[in-house]
Amino acid sequence: MSGLDGGNKLPLAQTGGLAAPDHASGDPDRDQCQGLREETEATQVMANTGGGSLETVAEGGASQDPVDCGPALRVPVAGSRGGAATKAGQEDAPPSTKGLEAASAAEAADSSQKNGCQLGEPRGPAGQKALEACGAGGLGSQMIPGKKAKEVTTKKRAISAAVEKEGEAGAAMEEKKVVQKEKKVAGGVKEETRPRAPKINNCMDSLEAIDQELSNVNAQADRAFLQLERKFGRMRRLHMQRRSFIIQNIPGFWVTAFRNHPQLSPMISGQDEDMLRYMINLEVEELKHPRAGCKFKFIFQGNPYFRNEGLVKEYERRSSGRVVSLSTPIRWHRGQDPQAHIHRNREGNTIPSFFNWFSDHSLLEFDRIAEIIKGELWPNPLQYYLMGEGPRRGIRGPPRQPVESARSFRFQSG
């Protein structure tokens, strides 16, 4: 009996030793399954030899198919032949069972981890019974959905992280593109603004060069004009001398021309007309420079009004640009001074004497007299002389204008 009891205790000790198998050599699952199978067979033989029945002492143990390789621990208990031994075995069984339970849990966890399964810690007897009821395959099949969920969650997190990274990378790329575009635009603006100053300088230089060329051309034109003026002035002078010689033989030619001029006629009174009847010649002479001024010379016969044979009115342009007028004083016979008489024109309006033009340099209308004589009457006096006899003489067309229009000197008193 004692030997049988000792034989019953040996497998427990061996089983406790098998709880922590050596995983270094061979397949731990296969070795574990083989050891458990041999232990179970030895326990059954010993129970049959003792004439007792086997009872399960450890509540957490469960038999499994060797293929599943789950932990299966069974403790033999003696029957009626060894009551004391049975009690002793029952008293000794709880500590051994606790060791076996821990070994079984460690074995199951190790086997499940190697097979790709995840096991939680057994909590109390209910957890141990669940481990007994289910094999390694059952535990694996129950834990697979949790693993898949964890893998799916991990994949989702990885995908979301990748999406976030891609979004950040895309935002960074867009920001870089915007910065590059701004830099390009700023660079283009700088490139446009940098050469602008040289371009403006070049344009200004070109304009200054053109202005200088125009000034040179104008100076050449002035010199050429002076040369032509002098050349054709000499030619005109010959014709003017011949014209003056002919006019002197026509009595009252100039007084008729003055009286027929539409702008000069209102400035001539009856007494002025009588004095102009003694006028035999009119000369208009430009100074050395045509723009410097001109000189008017009235030639008279002896008359009862004044002693002068010629009356001169000269307009001269000073260096300041101001035009001044100079004239010859008129030596009047006693009582013939125009200031002593009231002068009226043909319309009966009171007017100053035309001869005041030689002495008074303040009236603007006297400056107008100089412009009319120089620009209209002197170039072609014949058309004004014939204006009163137009229908009889058969004058055709408008009066002939001079080749060069007269220049206005803005005659002012000096």
From Swiss-Prot:
Protein's name according to its UniProt entry: Testis-specific Y-encoded-like protein 4
Basic and acidic residues biased stretches: 24-40
Protein's organism: Homo sapiens (Human)
Gene label: TSPYL4
Superkingdom assignment: Eukaryota
Compositional bias ranges of the Low complexity kind: 101-112
UniProt-annotated stretches for the region Disordered: 1-129, 391-414
Entry similarity comment: Belongs to the nucleosome assembly protein (NAP) family.
GO molecular function, one term: chromatin binding
